[in-house]
């Protein structure tokens, strides 16, 4: 893998410097250039008490970017969370609206915010998942795998606790990782995403995998009942319930609140004590929900779910 470091401008103005030592960088000099051999540069996000870095790697002859947030309480044997942006979006925007930094500071894990590439047919950022992204030749699964290898080289991580979550297209990509990078992904949560027919039809994980779906009945972008390029949420849940050999009848918990509430279905008695869970919110649209305008807080819900599992199932 050829690593390239640069201080970049990607649709926004970024400033680098300060904030601790960079992975692969023993120097305090952050004035690097395109010829530097350093893989990452400190990035002043102004969010969280930990350290943020911006990194560039070359994968499949394309320069790819990702951000690393190292929680302030990071120690050895840390878990890894990939947080994937939606279609037309940016990794930095995802960093801002998810707010995983504060949770990472408390729990001591590392968050990775990768950046998708431009879909040639639309000129919009995307993850290659089939469906409406058909025609893309970007190897996003390989890109995520290469990030994992890089992080494993630079940090002390627990390779049995690598997770993915994402909004919309990022949720679709998280499911694709659970299918196509199953040997490394322990569990995933999709927020307002689903599975494309291509992912659904070819999915063959190597182990029982805990998954959760957070979705709104008012979502007009990724309809709960599916579309030509998106499987209905019920079919997605049924797929994972069947693959994990879960009980077919869920425990249903009502989610009460001032914004319409919802239901939380839990499918248990699955292989390796994994679980399949659905949070279906009555008045939620195509959003990353929080308590300000919904009756669920996505980021804490995501971490509370994922952190219970490793690649072998429920953590004892």
Protein language model regions, located:
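Serine-hydrolase catalytic machinery in alpha/beta-hydrolase-like enzymes
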Residues: 56-163, 172-176, 180, 202, ...
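Alpha/beta-hydrolase
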Residues: 82-84, 191, 281
């Amino acid at each position: 893998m050829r690593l390239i470091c640069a201080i970049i401008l990607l649709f926004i103005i970024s400033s680098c410097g300060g904030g601790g030592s960079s992975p692969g960088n023993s120097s305090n000099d952050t004035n690097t250039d395109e010829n530097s051999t350093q893989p990452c540069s400190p990035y002043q996000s102004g969010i969280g008490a930990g350290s943020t870095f911006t990194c560039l790697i070359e994968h499949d002859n394309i320069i790819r970017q990702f951000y690393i947030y190292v929680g302030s309480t990071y120690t050895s044997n840390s878990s890894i969370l990939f947080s994937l942006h939606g279609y037309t979006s940016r990794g930095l925007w995802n960093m801002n609206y998810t707010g995983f930094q504060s949770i990472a500071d408390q729990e001591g894990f590392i968050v990775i915010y990768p950046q998708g590439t431009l879909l040639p047919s639309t000129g919009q950022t995307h993850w290659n998942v089939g469906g409406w992204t058909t025609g893309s030749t970007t190897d996003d699964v390989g890109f995520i795998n290469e990030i994992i290898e890089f992080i494993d080289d630079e940090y002390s991580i627990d390779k049995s606790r690598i997770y993915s979550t994402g909004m919309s297209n990022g949720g679709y990509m998280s499911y694709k990782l659970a299918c196509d990078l199953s040997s490394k992904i322990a569990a995933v949560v999709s927020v307002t995403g689903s599975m494309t027919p291509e992912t659904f039809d070819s999915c063959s994980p190597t182990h029982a995998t805990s998954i959760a779906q957070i979705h709104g009945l008012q979502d007009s972008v990724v309809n709960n009942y599916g579309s030509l390029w998106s499987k209905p949420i019920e079919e997605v849940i049924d797929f994972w319930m069947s693959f994990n050999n879960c009980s077919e009848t869920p425990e249903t918990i009502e989610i009460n609140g001032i914004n319409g509430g919802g239901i939380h279905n839990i499918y248990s008695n699955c292989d390796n004590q994994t679980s399949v869970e659905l949070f279906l919110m009555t008045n939620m649209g195509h959003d990353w929900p929080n308590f300000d305008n919904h009756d669920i807080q996505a980021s804490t819900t995501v971490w509370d779910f994922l952190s219970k599992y490793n690649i072998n199932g429920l953590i004892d």
